[in-house]
Curated annotation (Swiss-Prot):
This is Signal peptide peptidase-like 2C. It is a multi-pass membrane protein. Its EC number is 3.4.23.-. Keywords: Endoplasmic reticulum, Glycoprotein, Hydrolase, Membrane, Protease, Signal, Transmembrane, Transmembrane helix. Glycosylated. The keyword Membrane applies. Residues 214-260, 308-328, 374-384, 470-482, 526-690 are cytoplasmic. Residues 564-573 have a biased composition (Basic and acidic residues). GO terms for cellular component: cytoplasmic side of endoplasmic reticulum membrane; endoplasmic reticulum membrane; lumenal side of endoplasmic reticulum membrane.
């Protein structure tokens, strides 16, 4: 499946594809051997090959035979001795009705088993110092096809060297030691699969929901900035709004997710293939690099998840200003960073502890997945489809195609996930959720007690879930896409578990997860007739503007603007009366030709030069907000504010000119462009001479 681990979001994706759902496949089959003495008994794990003889499934059906210790003598016959049968009857052979325990030598398992069978033994335990010992890779083939070797009729199993020492220490001096070999049925399912299911679905749901909240917060900030441009009736409010806007911009810069482009998808898949091949050929060296990358990413992810919670506590106020510097250090965040680093170091030290270290690994893994889902964003459904299908092809290739090119016939993905059999480090990739088996089985004694799920099976579909929730926030669809995609992920994971149970082998989980999430998202978008918006990610075009940001149209003007219009009418009437009384030469109506319009836009309000290039050439015609460009997220509707036209020519007004100028300057909207640094553009009718 997939693999993950890095500090930066892009680096984390480069390792996303190395983790698998595939549980390590056993070389041979696992069984148990029950060792019984007068006052002591214990079960040990063995690895046997069903190519010879299958072991009984129940202990009651397994013969309890005497144990013969042959570890101090060599046990490798010559090839010619295979065809020399014993003349004596089975009862007269030295190992009759015994199970022989011998050391691993230079000959094959078959040779040792044939020699024990020829001596009358009913079973053979081969002691091996190697880990992950295979039972089938050491079977020798006869050099002469015309003389086939005789078939084995006794079970041959591999016992670990440490277990042999434990048996000898407990049975020292005891002459009556008996053993029974059996292979109990493994449970088809285990309760730990339910825990893995909850962890995976919960992480995907939480990560997608968090990403959607960030999108909603960003949209609210933009709407607040859009409405804040007209609220400048006093200088204090203006300064406060500017400071708040700068703080918002800083937060957006720190929390802004990284958009993932199709070019990045190709680069990630190419580099992931390279990393997979490096792990396949240089596993013992490169696995430590992966552990280091996971440690850095996990500590960062844990910090990013806990920091927002810490910011709501009273301890947030404690800060320390560095002497001679303008930088302040927040003590709670500094302590939190140290705590996250300590947790990661604790896991690194005890990562191979099977009893409790998996709790730390799962905690760090969930935090890391949430961090990546927050910080990496697929901006369109087109990018999501390309990304998920590329990883699906990557997964299928390394699971089903690579066995055609490997010497052992196993896929590179399985070798990397379970670790090479000849690995000297015995390390495992940490980019997995692992939960121990909760039911007793042979795997519990055989150091195979965990079920695993790769981070890639969580994060890769999680990107689509996060995109769906962001789109919900943009089109205000009551989280329809988010809920549908999350349920589809849960169903796909259940199908993966069922397929693994039915086929008795690991499954490429992305084959089911990608199919279920993509098809469900497409179906929802098609039913809602939003496929084009969903495909291009243009959901923000449907967000209604705030009332304070609407154009100056009679039907959309707020109560505050209506009061200002009423005040304008009263002021105009007073001007008309003054003109009629003093000069009698002016008309009593200012009319449409007396109107002056100030065109404002968000670009002009936020641009350092005070105007935008797109504002050149605009006229005083009525603008429909639906016809304005929506390509740039910062482009807002133009706002038109009616102002009072300076009244007639100076030669005709006399001292009324002075009175009107003084009166106009006292109006709250006059001089707005001077205080705000905005460009004022007069209409053609306002510039025409009287």
């Amino acid at each position: 499946m997939a693999c993950l681990g890095s500090l930066h979001p892009l680096g984390s994706l480069l390792l996303l594809f190395l983790l698998l759902l595939l549980s390590p496949e056993a070389r041979g089959e696992y069984g148990l051997v029950r060792v019984v003495s007068k006052n002591w008994s214990k079960d040990y794990c063995v690895l046997y090959s069903s190519d010879y003889v299958n072991l009984p499934r129940d202990l009651h059906h397994a013969p309890l035979l005497s144990l013969h210790d042959g570890t101090k003598t060599p046990w490798c016959p010559d090839e010619d001795s295979f065809h020399q049968a014993q003349d004596s009857s089975p009862r007269q052979r030295p190992l009759h009705q015994t199970t022989t325990m011998v050391t691993r030598g230079n000959c094959s398992f078959y040779a040792k088993g044939w020699l024990a069978q020829d001596q009358g033994a009913q079973g053979l335990l081969i002691v091996s110092r190697a880990r992950n010992q295979q039972c089938s890779d050491t079977i020798s083939k006869p050099q002469d096809p015309s003389k086939p070797w005789p078939a084995l009729t006794i079970p041959v199993a591999v016992l670990r060297y440490t277990d042999m020492l434990d048996i000898v220490s407990h049975t020292y001096g005891d002459t009556d030691v008996r053993v029974a070999m059996f292979a109990p049925l493994e449970p088809v399912t285990d309760y730990n699969m339910a825990i893995i299911f909850i962890l995976a679905v919960g992480t995907v749901a939480a990560g997608g929901y968090w990403a959607g909240l960030m999108e909603a917060n960003k949209l609210q900030r933009r709407q607040a900035q859009r409405g804040g441009g007209l609220g400048g009736h006093n200088q204090q409010q203006t300064v406060a709004a500017e400071r708040s806007q700068r703080a918002w911009e800083d937060d957006d810069f720190e929390d802004a997710p990284m958009d993932f482009t199709p070019a990045m998808t190709g680069a990630v898949v190419t580099m992931s293939c390279s990393i997979m091949i490096l792990l396949y050929f240089f596993y013992d060296c490169f696995v430590y690099v992966m552990i280091g990358i996971f440690s850095l990413g996990a500590s960062t992810g844990l910090y990013s998840c806990l920091a927002p919670i810490l910011c709501h506590l009273p301890l947030w106020r404690y800060q320390w200003v560095l002497p001679g510097q303008r930088v302040s250090v927040t003590w709670p965040l500094l302590l939190l960073a140290g705590l996250c680093a300590m947790v990661t170091v604790l896991w690194v030290i005890h990562r191979n502890e099977d009893h409790w270290a998996w709790l730390l690994q799962d905690t760090l893994g969930v935090a890391y997945c949430l961090f990546v889902l927050r910080r990496v964003r697929l901006p369109t459904f087109k990018n999501c489809t390309l990304f998920l299908l590329a990883l699906l092809a990557f997964d299928v290739f390394f699971v089903f195609i690579t066995p055609l090119f490997t010497k052992t016939g196993e896929s590179i993905m399985v070798e990397v996930a379970s670790g090479p059999a000849d690995s000297s480090s015995h390390e495992r990739l940490p980019m997995v959720l692992k939960v121990p088996r909760l039911s007793f089985s042979a795997l519990t004694l055989c150091n195979q007690p965990f079920s695993i799920l790769g981070f890639g099976d969580i994060v890769v579909p999680g990107f689509l879930v996060a995109y769906c929730h962001r789109f919900d926030m943009q089109v205000q669809s009551r989280q329809v896409y988010y809920m549908a995609c999350t349920v589809a992920y849960a169903v796909g994971l259940l199908v993966t578990f069922v397929a693994m149970i039915l086929m008795q082998m690991g499954q490429p989980a992305l084959l089911y997860l990608v199919s279920s999430t993509l098809l469900t998202s497409l179906a929802v978008a098609t039913c809602r007739q939003e496929f084009t918006l969903f495909w291009t990610g243009q959901g923000r075009a449907k967000i209604p503007a705030e009332p304070v940001a609407q154009p100056c149209i009679a039907s959309a003007v707020g109560s505050k603007m209506k009061l200002e219009d009423a005040k304008d009418s009263r002021t105009t009437n007073r001007f008309e009366q003054a003109v009629d009384g003093e000069s009698g030469d002016l008309e009593s109506s200012t009319g449409d030709d007396m109107a002056e319009m100030v065109t404002l836009s968000e670009d002009e309000a936020t641009s350092p030069e005070g105007h935008s290039e797109s504002s050149e050439g605009w006229s005083d015609t009525n603008l429909d907000p639906n016809e304005l460009p929506s390509g740039s997220p910062m482009a807002l509707e133009a706002m038109l504010i009616p102002l009072i036209q300076p009244i007639p020519h100076p030669s005709e007004l006399g001292h009324i000119r002075t009175q009107s100028r003084v009166h106009d300057s006292s109006l709250p909207w006059m001089g707005l462009h001077k205080r705000k640094g905005l460009k004022v553009k007069k209409s053609m009718s306002a510039q025409a001479p009287l």
